[in-house]
C-alpha cells in the first residue's frame, strides 16, 4: 500500500526541560487525561509562562517508528527582532485561530482523488484521513473551549469543495449539537472501500495500519460542543471555488449531485496530468466532461449542490451572527476585548485561481479602518498571506503606515510561519498557521500582553482533543507520505510557540 509511510522521523522539535520532575508530572497528567486537558489546567489570565496547549505537552514520535506518543511541550521562545525582551505585566486580549479545516464530503462525485498519484500540486487531492475532517474540527473546538478567549477566528477553507452539505456540517459543528456527517447512502461509498482494487488508496479495512470499521464509524452521528467564544469567519478559496480553483458551472453542479464517481484516470489522462498538461482548473473541467477513466456508482444526494460565492458568504455571515447584506466581499471589523481591533480582509478570488488577491478598493477601505481603530492595537486576518497575494504589497504598505498594527495572521499555506516585518511604525509580525486537515492538525492560540517596553504577542499551538476519532485522523495524517510531516508543515521551533515583542508606538517615519 503506497500511501502510508511507517518510517516516520520525529516531526516535532522538543525543548530541553527545565526540570526533569516537572515534565515527568506533566507527561503523566497528559497521558491520563489528554494533552488538551492539560491546557485547561495550565492556562493563566496573568503573565505566567505556563499557558498550556503544546507549551505543556504534545505528540511526538520518539523512536521514529511512525507511532505518536505523548511527550514534553515547547515553552515560548522569545523573539526580539522588533523589540527587546521585557517583563510581561498583564493580558490585553486572548483569542485563537482555526484554519483550513477542509470539512469535506469524501463520497462526493465532485472530488478528484485520482490526481493525487501525480504528486506535486495535486499532492493533497487524497488524504488517508479525509473521512474524519468533521470530527477533527469538533475536537479542535473542544480543545479551544478550555481556554478563556475573547474570540475565535476561522481563517478560511472551512470546507473543501463549496458543497451545501459540507457547509451544513461545518457550521453545525461550530454551532454545536448532534452532527450527521453522512451523505448519499448510510454505508460508505468511496475510493477507500475494501472493494476498490486500486492499491494507491488507503483502505482501512484491509491496509496497514488496519482500522476495521473506521469508514462506517466515520459516517455515524457525533456530538460537537460548539464554539464557546464568539467566532468570526474569513472566507477561503475552497469555500467559494470548485476544488478551490474555479467558479461552479452547470457542468460541475451536475457532477456534484450525480451518481458516478471517478476512481482512476485512463492512461492518456494520467499521462497528461503527470506531464503538467492538467492543472487545477483543468481538473474541474475534467470532472465535467466525460470522466475519462474507471468510475464507481454512488448514491446521489441533492444536498451536495454547489453554492454560489454570494450564497457562501451570506451563509457564513448569518452563522456567525454578523447579519446579512454586507456586500459581495467578506470585509469587516470587530473588537477583541477593549484594547484590540480586528480587521478581516477578503483575499479570495471569485472567478478562478487559488492565490490570494487584494483589490485596490480594499486597500482604501483598509486605510480607513486603520484610522478608525484609534488607540486600539490592530490585528489583521486574511486567508491567503498578504505577502504572497496579488495586490498584497499595497495592503502591507498600509499596515506599515500604522503605529498600532501587531500582526497579520493568515492560513491557506497549511504551514506554520512567524516572520518579522520592519516598518516605519516600528514593525509587526506576519503569521501563518498550519491546517487542521494535514499534520500536525493544530489550532493556534494568542494573547496580547502588556510589557515594560510596550506589548508582546504570545502565540502557541493547541492539539485537538484526544478522545474521539480525531485522534485516529492525526495518526493517519502523520503517516501520510505526501502530508504535513514530510513537507515540514509544522515549521521550525521559531514558527510555533513564541513570544513576539513589539516596541511602544512611535511616530511613523516617512
Task: For each feature predicted by the language model, list its residue ranges.
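Metal-dependent catalytic neighborhoods of phosphoester/phosphodiester hydrolases
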Residues: 154-175, 204, 216-219, 242-256, ...
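Metal-dependent phosphoesterase/phosphodiesterase active-site architecture
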Residues: 3, 10, 43-145, 150-151, ...
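Terminal targeting segments of Actinobacterial cell-envelope proteins
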Residues: 1-19
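Active-site-proximal segments of metal-dependent phosphoesterases and phosphodiesterases across multiple
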Residues: 349-364, 368-410
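Active-site environment of divalent metal-dependent phosphoester hydrolases
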Residues: 104-105, 160-162, 239-244, 351-352, ...
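Hydrophobic alpha-helical membrane-insertion segments, chiefly the h-region
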Residues: 31-42
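N-terminal Sec-pathway targeting helices
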Residues: 14-30
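Active-site neighborhood of phospho(di)ester-bond hydrolases with catalytic His/Asp-centered motifs
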Residues: 97-99, 151-157, 227, 232-237, ...
Amino acid at each position: 500500500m503506497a500511501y502510508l509511510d511507517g518510517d516516520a522521523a520525529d516531526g516535532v522539535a522538543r525543548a530541553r526541560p527545565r526540570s526533569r520532575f516537572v515534565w515527568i508530572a506533566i507527561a503523566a497528567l497528559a497521558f491520563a487525561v489528554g494533552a488538551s486537558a492539560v491546557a485547561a489546567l495550565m492556562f493563566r489570565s496573568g503573565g505566567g509562562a505556563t499557558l498550556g496547549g503544546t507549551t505543556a505537552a504534545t505528540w511526538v514520535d520518539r523512536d521514529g517508528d511512525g507511532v505518536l506518543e505523548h511527550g514534553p511541550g515547547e515553552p515560548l521562545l522569545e523573539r526580539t527582532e522588533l523589540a527587546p525582551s521585557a517583563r510581561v505585566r498583564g493580558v490585553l486580549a486572548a483569542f485563537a485561530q482555526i484554519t483550513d479545516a477542509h470539512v469535506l464530503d469524501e463520497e462526493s462525485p465532485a472530488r478528484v482523488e485520482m490526481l493525487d498519484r501525480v504528486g506535486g500540486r495535486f499532492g493533497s487531492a487524497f488524504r488517508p484521513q479525509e473521512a474524519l475532517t468533521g470530527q477533527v474540527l469538533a475536537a479542535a473546538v473542544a480543545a479551544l473551549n478550555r481556554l478563556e478567549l475573547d474570540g475565535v477566528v476561522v481563517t478560511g477553507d472551512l470546507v473543501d469543495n463549496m458543497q451545501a452539505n459540507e457547509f451544513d456540517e461545518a457550521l453545525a459543528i461550530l454551532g454545536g449539537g448532534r452532527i450527521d456527517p453522512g451523505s448519499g447512502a448510510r454505508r460508505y461509498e468511496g475510493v477507500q472501500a475494501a472493494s476498490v482494487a486500486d492499491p494507491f488508496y488507503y483502505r482501512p479495512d484491509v491496509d496497514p495500519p488496519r482500522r476495521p470499521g473506521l469508514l462506517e464509524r466515520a459516517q455515524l452521528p457525533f456530538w460537537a460542543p460548539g464554539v464557546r467564544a464568539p467566532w468570526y469567519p474569513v472566507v477561503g478559496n475552497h469555500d467559494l471555488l470548485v476544488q478551490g480553483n474555479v467558479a461552479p458551472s452547470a457542468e460541475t453542479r451536475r457532477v456534484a449531485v450525480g451518481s458516478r464517481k471517478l476512481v482512476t484516470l485512463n492512461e492518456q489522462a494520467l499521462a497528461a496530468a503527470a506531464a503538467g498538461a492538467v492543472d487545477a482548473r483543468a481538473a474541474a473541467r475534467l470532472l465535467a466532461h466525460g470522466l475519462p477513466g474507471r468510475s464507481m456508482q454512488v448514491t446521489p444526494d441533492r444536498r451536495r449542490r454547489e453554492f454560489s460565492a454570494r450564497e457562501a458568504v451570506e451563509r457564513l455571515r448569518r452563522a456567525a451572527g454578523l447579519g446579512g447584506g454586507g456586500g459581495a466581499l467578506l470585509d469587516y471589523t470587530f473588537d477583541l476585548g477593549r484594547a484590540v481591533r480586528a480587521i478581516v480582509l477578503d483575499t479570495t478570488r471569485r472567478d478562478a485561481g487559488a492565490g490570494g488577491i487584494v483589490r485596490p478598493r480594499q486597500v482604501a477601505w483598509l486605510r480607513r479602518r486603520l484610522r478608525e481603530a484609534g488607540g486600539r492595537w490592530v490585528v489583521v486576518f486574511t486567508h491567503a498571506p498578504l505577502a504572497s497575494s496579488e495586490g498584497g504589497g499595497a495592503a502591507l504598505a498600509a499596515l506599515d503606515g500604522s503605529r498600532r498594527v501587531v500582526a497579520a495572521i493568515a492560513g491557506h499555506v497549511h504551514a506554520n510561519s512567524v516572520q518579522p516585518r520592519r516598518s516605519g511604525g516600528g514593525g509587526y509580525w506576519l503569521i501563518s498557521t498550519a491546517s487542521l486537515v494535514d499534520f500536525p492538525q493544530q489550532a493556534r492560540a494568542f494573547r496580547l500582553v502588556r510589557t515594560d517596553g510596550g506589548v508582546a504577542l504570545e502565540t502557541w499551538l493547541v492539539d485537538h482533543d484526544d478522545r474521539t476519532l480525531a485522534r485516529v485522523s492525526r495518526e493517519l495524517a502523520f503517516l501520510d507520505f505526501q502530508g504535513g510531516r514530510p513537507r515540514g508543515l509544522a515549521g521550525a521551533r521559531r514558527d510555533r510557540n513564541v513570544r513576539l515583542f513589539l516596541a511602544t508606538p512611535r511616530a511613523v517615519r516617512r
